[in-house]
């Protein structure tokens, strides 16, 4: 049984990144889908960090991924909280309807 090489992980990361790019360009209406695509993009980059870190034998990349995931979790929580407030005030999460500022 053959083990997975660095190229396998990099191809998987590239596929995940491409799926997130396609998700952003195809669905530009829903803010929740946009946030999920951006998070998938960040996870693809983190997968590449871990793959290179394991391949080079350096744990600094894996530790860096933990910090990135912590910041990404906080970013997601804040983004979803903003979306809840927008939905309560405007009754929509459509990107086209969020173009006006009210002071």
Curated annotation (Swiss-Prot):
E.C. no: 7.1.1.-
GO molecular function, one term: quinone binding
Gene Ontology CC: NADH dehydrogenase complex; plasma membrane
Entry-linked InterPro entries: NADH_UbQ_OxRdtase_chain4L/K, NUOK/Mnh_C1-like
Gene3D superfamilies tied to this protein: 1.10.287.3510
Membrane topology: Multi-pass membrane protein
Keywords per UniProt: Cell inner membrane, Cell membrane, Membrane, NAD, Quinone, Translocase, Transmembrane, Transmembrane helix, Transport, Ubiquinone
Pfam family, any one: Oxidored_q2
Compartment(s) of residence: Cell inner membrane
TM region positions: 6-26, 32-52, 63-83
Uppermost EC category: translocase
GO BP annotations, alphabetical order: ATP synthesis coupled electron transport
Reactions catalysed according to its record: a quinone + NADH + 5 H(+)(in) = a quinol + NAD(+) + 4 H(+)(out)
Family per record: Belongs to the complex I subunit 4L family.
Matches recorded under HAMAP family: NDH1_NuoK
Oligomer status and interactors: NDH-1 is composed of 14 different subunits. Subunits NuoA, H, J, K, L, M, N constitute the membrane sector of the complex.
Function in brief: NDH-1 shuttles electrons from NADH, via FMN and iron-sulfur (Fe-S) centers, to quinones in the respiratory chain. The immediate electron acceptor for the enzyme in this species is believed to be ubiquinone. Couples the redox reaction to proton translocation (for every two electrons transferred, four hydrogen ions are translocated across the cytoplasmic membrane), and thus conserves the redox energy in a proton gradient.
Protein name: NADH-quinone oxidoreductase subunit K
